[in-house]
Amino acid sequence: AVPKSLAATGVHVRVLIPAYPALADLAAAGQVAMSFDDLFGGPARIIAVQAEGLDMLLLDAPHLYDRAGNIYLGPDGKDWHDNDLRFAALSFAAAQIGLNGLGDWMPGVINAHDWQAGLVPAYLRQDGRPAPPVVMTIHNIAFQGVFDAKRLSPLRLNSELFTTDGIEYFGKISFLKAGLALSQKITTVSPSYAAELLTPDFGMGLDGLLRERQMDLYGILNGIDLDVWDPETDASLIATYSATKLAGKAKNRAELEARFGLTKSDGPLFCVVSRLTSQK
């Protein structure tokens, strides 16, 4: 929703994401915009495509992303053993784009989201060339991308960055810590969450760093894409409805009760789409 909203104001936005298997058809329809001979263990390409009215950049690296399981976990439910390389590659590619790797377009600002993109400012910092500022966005500070310090070399990170003011985190590497320490600005999903992150109870070990940087920390309340979450046009619903035509809402409730074996009731019915975790 954020890229679409920015684009609507005239900002030229490009969204970089890994070319996961579910995006294979979309990638096949695109144009190669940039290539890497060796991106953390194999060749890779950045493919330019358009989707939902947005300019997308797909990082096509089959050795890192073309596999069974889900985005973060293997079929056994455990983290992929090379998740550090998989998401270092995403950060490295973003940094190269920021250094004019595409040739015909260079971002004015890079917005990196969560630990998976946390190394973007680290790669820009160690390169040394003029680069766009980085805004680091925290969606959930509990996920920090922590890996053994021995991974510095495989991750193509200079040892000079391994300091308390850089990527070092209790003797290990933290991708999220790197993003928070080295970015120019930090945002998160609400003003209240931004305030919570400054406390030991909710800062998950990074509250001290965030207190040091609180003048650069902004809480921006999460919104939704009103085109996607519109019950009047949502094709995934049993029946559509609107604020003035509510009949379809009752049909959706009946379907939900039937699907989950709920006892029919006239009382309120609340539904939550969420991870099952103590945080929620």
Language-model segment annotations:
Residues 1-280:
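Catalytic cores of nucleotide-sugar-dependent glycosyltransferases that transfer UDP/GDP/TDP-activated
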